[in-house]
C-alpha cells in the first residue's frame, strides 16, 4: 500500500474553549474557526494533497443549545455562498458527506449547488462532514445492502468492498492521516471505517489557533513514521 499522504482528515475541535479563554461568546470562536478552515483548505490545495475531510457538524451536535445549532446552520449556509469564488478560483472540488436529509431544503440546495458547480475539478477535493457520524453512515450502508442485496458476495473481501462502495466516501481515497486539534484524544465517531490504517495525531492547539505551519510540522512527523498496513517491515 502507498504511504504517500493523499487524504487528510481533521476533527476541528476547540472553537468554544478558544472563545471562552477570550471572554467571548462561542459564536466568536466558530467564526474564527471558519477562517482557519479556509486557510488550511487553501494550503492543502496548494501542496498536492488529493483530499481534505473536515468534521464540521456531527450527528451528536444537534444536542447543543438550539441557539448555537441555529447559528451554525446560518454560518454554514453563509460560508458556502460567500466562499463559492474561493472554490472556483483555486480549482477545489467540494463534497459533503453525512445524512443531509437532516437539514433544511434551503441548506441542502446550497450544498448541492456548490457540489455541482465544482464537480469537474479533479486535483483536490475538500469534504465537509455534515450531520455525519460513522455509526449512522455504516447503518445506512448496511440498510442499503439489506434492501438491495448483491448476488456476487462469496467471501469477506467482497463483502468489505460492497460496504465501502455504499459509504458516503465511496469515491474518495482511504484516510492516511487523522488529526484532532484541541487536546482531546478520541475519534468521536468520525470516519471509523475509512481510518483503519490511518496515522493518528492529537495536538493541544485549539482549532482557531491552528495554522498551516502547524500542519506542516505534523505532516513532517507523518513522513517519519513507518506505515506497516498490518505487514512486517524490516
UniProtKB/Swiss-Prot annotation:
Binds 2 magnesium ions per subunit. CDD domains: Cis_IPPS. The active site is at residues 13, 61. Its cofactor is Mg(2+). Keywords: Magnesium, Metal-binding, Transferase. It is an enzyme of class 2 (transferase). Pfam families: Prenyltransf. The keyword Magnesium applies. GO terms for biological process: polyprenol biosynthetic process. Its EC number is 2.5.1.-. GO terms for cellular component: cytosol. NCBIfam families: PRK14833.1, uppS. Catalyzes the condensation of isopentenyl diphosphate (IPP) with allylic pyrophosphates generating different type of terpenoids. Homodimer. This is Isoprenyl transferase.
Amino acid at each position: 500500500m502507498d504511504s504517500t499522504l493523499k487524504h487528510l482528515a481533521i476533527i476541528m475541535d476547540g472553537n468554544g474553549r478558544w472563545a471562552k479563554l477570550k471572554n467571548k461568546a462561542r459564536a466568536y470562536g466558530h467564526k474564527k474557526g471558519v477562517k482557519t478552515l479556509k486557510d488550511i483548505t487553501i494550503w492543502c490545495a496548494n501542496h498536492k494533497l488529493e483530499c481534505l475531510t473536515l468534521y464540521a457538524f456531527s450527528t451528536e451536535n444537534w444536542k447543543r443549545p438550539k441557539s448555537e445549532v441555529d447559528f451554525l446552520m446560518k454560518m454554514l449556509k453563509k460560508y458556502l455562498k460567500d466562499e463559492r469564488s474561493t472554490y472556483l478560483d483555486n480549482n477545489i472540488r467540494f463534497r459533503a458527506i453525512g445524512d443531509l436529509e437532516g437539514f433544511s431544503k434551503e441548506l441542502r440546495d446550497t450544498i448541492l449547488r456548490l457540489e455541482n458547480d465544482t464537480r469537474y475539478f479533479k486535483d483536490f477535493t475538500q469534504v465537509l462532514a455534515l450531520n455525519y457520524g460513522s455509526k449512522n453512515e455504516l447503518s445506512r450502508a448496511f440498510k442499503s445492502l439489506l434492501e438491495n442485496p448483491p448476488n456476487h458476495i462469496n467471501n469477506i473481501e467482497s463483502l468489505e468492498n460492497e460496504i465501502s462502495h455504499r459509504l458516503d466516501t465511496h469515491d474518495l481515497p482511504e484516510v492516511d492521516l487523522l488529526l484532532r486539534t484541541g487536546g482531546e484524544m478520541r475519534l468521536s465517531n468520525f470516519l471509523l471505517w475509512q481510518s483503519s490504517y490511518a496515522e493518528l495525531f492529537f495536538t493541544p492547539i485549539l482549532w482557531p489557533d491552528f495554522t498551516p505551519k502547524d500542519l506542516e510540522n505534523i505532516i513532517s512527523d507523518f513522513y517519519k513514521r513507518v506505515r506497516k498496513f498490518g505487514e512486517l517491515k524490516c
